[in-house]
Structures are given as C-alpha cells and as structure tokens.
Amino acid sequence: MTENNDIKMVIITGMSGAGKTVALQSFEDLGYFCVDNLPPMLLPKFVELMADSKSKMNKVALGIDLRGREFFEHLWGALDDLSERTWIIPHILFLDAKDSTLVTRYKETRRSHPLAPTGLPLKGIEAERGLLTDMKARANIVLDTSDLKPKELREKIVQLFSTETEQAFRVNVMSFGFKYGIPIDADLVFDVRFLPNPYYIPHMKPLTGLDEEVSSYVLKFNETHKFLEKLTDLITFMLPHYKREGKSQLVIAIGCTGGQHRSVTLAEYLGKHLKPDYSVHVSHRDVEKRKGH
C-alpha cells in the first residue's frame, strides 16, 4: 500500500439503541464500504483482504457489537495491529445516549435489550455501559444521540466525516425509453412523448439526442421551450427542499418512447441547467438500443 491508497476506517460502536444502524446508513451515503456486526476477531483478516484487494476500497465503516468481554481482548489486539499499519487511518466513533432515552427507545420499538432479553431494559443498559467504559475512553469521537432525531444524527455524521465534495447534494438526470420500462430508482419521472418525434424523419432515425441535428430539432419547437421553462422552474424549486430533508441524491428520469431522441435531448438540457448549482451526473439508459420507437 502507498500513501495514495490510504484507507480511512471508521469503527462504529457504542450503546445498543444509540443509533448504529442510522450511522451505518449515513456512512454508506458518503460512499463508505459498510459491514455491520463484524466480530472483532475477524478485523485483522478483513484488513488483510483490504490490503490485497485491487479495488478502490479506500473508505470503510465497520459496525462492531461488543457484548462479551472476550470480544474486547480481540478488539484491543486488532486496534494495536492497525496502529502499526501506516496505510490505514482508523477512527472509533462511539454512540451514546442517556439511560432514560435508551429505555424510551426500547419501549417504543418493543425490543428487548440484548443484555437483558427477559428483564428490564435499564438492567441491560447498566450492564452494557459498564462493559463499554474502556471502549468509550479510547474512542476518537463520542457522539451523544439523546436529543438527535435520525435525520439530525445523519447530518451530524456528514458534518464530521465528509469532505466538501461528499457533502454535495447529487442530482442524477437520466433519459430512458418507456418501451423498456420506467427506471426503478427514479424519484421523479417526466414523460416527454408529447413532443415532436425526430424518429419519423428518416435521416434522424439512427441518430440520438446527443447529435446536434437531433437536439436542435427537438429544441426548436415552442412546446419544448414552454415545457423546459416549467420543468426547470419546478426542479429548481424542489431541489433545495429535498436537500433540506436529508436526501443525499435525487434521480430525475425523463422518458420518451425509445429513449434515443427527445428524452436524451431534454436530459442533456436539464443537466446543463443544473450544473452551476449542483453536482450533476447525466446518463442515457437506453440510447444504444436501436430497436425503434
């Protein structure tokens, strides 16, 4: 491993019910490779696999559950081993919460505490807190989630662990053909089959909306201009609200019949319109499918 291949590793642990699941989901949104409930004794082997991997796995978040004293012996040894590896940068994130908050969360979810499966949650919380005293002391960051809603916890993690680029709200604009199905990951879908179709002009049939002649044709119509005016106004209004609600990305799908001409032209237009203000990626799902509209 070289310095250019340094791996940032975050070990997520803490009190049961303090938000580990939300934390892992947040790291996943930040592009981390996430593994939940990794036994501490497997950490050295996992690190070896990362070192041997030819993939660009340079950010890893591990959820580690520590409910038995024997786990700590393995963990301390593994952490000492990590400290000797110059190409890996480990951080320990300890999630905590007030006892009263944890009790309330267990009651709301009707789950039993793992250390008190048949008893009162508070007994299990007290036992777990005692087990985790040393772990909390060793953590780089201790985060109290008592007064944090899931959305607020996510925002806190993004603030603590993301770069400016990773914090950017990502917008994916995709063209597609309805004949091949609506993209299952689309958040917003717009149908542009009402616009004039270049497919029926013989010399444009084999072309796509990426070709200047096709895009100029589609964009020359008054109805296209009116639609784009309304579409850009709507999207520009909606995006800040989606971002404020905690979404890390939005997929906008624009469809025509075959996904080659009209939808491609408008997806390109929308992408260029949004790029000055957002991190935008434009893709064309069906542009290579030459099967006719």
Curated annotation (Swiss-Prot):
The keyword Nucleotide-binding applies. It comes from the Bacteria. Displays ATPase and GTPase activities. The keyword Hydrolase does not apply. GTP binds at D65, L66, R67, G68. ATP binds at G14, M15, S16, G17, A18, G19, K20, T21. Keywords: ATP-binding, GTP-binding, Nucleotide-binding. Belongs to the RapZ-like family. InterPro entries: P-loop_NTPase, RapZ-like, RapZ-like_N, RapZ_C. This is Nucleotide-binding protein Bcer98_3698. One of its GO terms (molecular function) is ATP binding.
